[in-house]
Design a protein with these regions (language model features):
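Substrate-binding surface in catalytic domains of secreted glycosidases
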Residues: 1-110
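Flexible, active-site-adjacent loop/turn segments at secondary-structure boundaries
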Residues: 27, 43-44, 81, 114, ...
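Active-site rim elements
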Residues: 49-53, 138-145, 166-167
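Acidic/aromatic/glycine-rich contiguous surface patches that form carbohydrate-binding/processing clefts
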Residues: 85-87, 146-184
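Hydrophobic, secondary-structure "cap" segments at the distal end of domains
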Residues: 103-161
Length: 184
């Protein structure tokens, strides 16, 4: 069952469908990515308040849409990414956020740690409203989740009474740092 961020057709029978399923996984990742015009957060917990040049969507807005559509809280699972996106060729404005880019690719959490986070060329920042970290340096913007943001999302799922959380993709977190944060 899809969530249409652009407000187009969305299945209107979620409450009927929900009686036949054990759970529905809300894949609250890839909310933004290389298909967009601007570098943005892959999976913001909440919608940033500043002006974004593209559509506004977040984990919270997606969960609320599913609940409004009739999926019971106890059947809804919140998906958390164990990967991020590297946007190259961004301008040094707003630390790369909402800037156009020349190329982009997905990269797993382990690769973000070894290839970017521990390099002095990149500065780690955290967006207070979106609740997620990002890196900026060398005209590169990197959107990802870390242990703190994964923990916040898991706490959000519990506070909302959701069935639980799920991850994509476990092999991107071989040290289980994110998995432990999700469980804790």
């Amino acid at each position: 069952m899809g969530y249409n961020r652009n407000g187009g057709y969305v299945c209107q029978r979620h409450s009927k469908v929900s009686q036949y399923i054990d759970y529905a996984l809300d894949m609250t990742y890839d909310l933004h990515g290389p298909w967009d015009t601007y570098a943005d957060f892959n999976s913001p917990l909440y919608t940033p308040t500043e002006s974004s040049p593209q559509y506004k969507i977040s984990v919270d807005s997606s969960i609320r849409a599913w609940l409004s559509a009739g999926i019971p809280k106890g059947k809804l699972v919140l998906g958390i990414p164990f990967y991020g996106y590297v946007y190259n060729g961004v301008k040094n404005t707003n630390n790369g956020l909402y800037q156009t880019f020349t190329s982009a690719k997905a990269v797993g959490y382990d690769s973000i740690i070894s290839n970017y986070l521990n390099k002095s060329a990149y500065t780690k920042l955290t967006h207070s409203t979106a609740g997620v970290p990002y890196l900026f340096g060398n005209n590169t913007f990197i959107s990802y989740d870390d242990a703190a943001s994964v923990k916040k999302k898991a706490q959000y799922a519990r506070s909302q009474g959701l069935r639980g959380t799920a991850a994509w993709e476990l092999s991107y977190d071989r040290s289980a740092v994110l998995l432990k944060a999700m469980a804790g």
